[in-house]
């Protein structure tokens, strides 16, 4: 069984990748490897956010919650 993606750990890993790449100490090959891992992690994080958004939408729709977003203008 596949392990469930941990969003918070994904963000931590992305931050590490960015810091490592920003250091400028990587070879081109290693930079491409880190970049590839970063893109994959970004997709996983975005997927987790989309899933959470869908769950929130379904929960609020079930309760006949109005679809106003008071935080939208922040």
From Swiss-Prot:
Enzyme class: hydrolase
Organism lineage: Bacteria, Pseudomonadati, Pseudomonadota, Gammaproteobacteria, Candidatus Pseudothioglobaceae
Function: Bidirectionally degrades single-stranded DNA into large acid-insoluble oligonucleotides, which are then degraded further into small acid-soluble oligonucleotides.
GO MF annotation: an example: exodeoxyribonuclease VII activity
Gene3D superfamilies in alphabetical order: Exonuclease VII, small subunit (1.10.287.1040)
Subcellular localization: Cytoplasm
Quaternary structure annotation from Swiss-Prot or TrEMBL: Heterooligomer composed of large and small subunits.
Family according to the record: Belongs to the XseB family.
InterPro entries noted in UniProt: Exonuc_VII_S, Exonuc_VII_ssu_sf
Catalytic activity: Exonucleolytic cleavage in either 5'- to 3'- or 3'- to 5'-direction to yield nucleoside 5'-phosphates
Protein name: Exodeoxyribonuclease 7 small subunit
Listed Pfam families: Exonuc_VII_S (PF02609)
Species annotation: Ruthia magnifica subsp. Calyptogena magnifica
E.C. numbers: 3.1.11.6
Keywords: Cytoplasm, Exonuclease, Hydrolase, Nuclease
A single BP term in Gene Ontology: DNA catabolic process
Entry GO terms, CC: cytosol; exodeoxyribonuclease VII complex
HAMAP family on file: Exonuc_7_S
């Amino acid at each position: 069984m596949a392990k469930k993606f941990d969003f918070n750990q994904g963000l931590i890993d992305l931050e590490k990748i960015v810091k490592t790449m920003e250091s400028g100490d990587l070879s081109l090959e290693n930079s491409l490897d880190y970049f590839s891992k970063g893109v994959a992690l970004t997709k996983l994080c975005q997927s987790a956010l989309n899933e959470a958004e869908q769950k929130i939408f379904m929960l609020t729709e079930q309760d006949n919650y109005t679809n106003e977003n008071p935080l939208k203008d922040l």
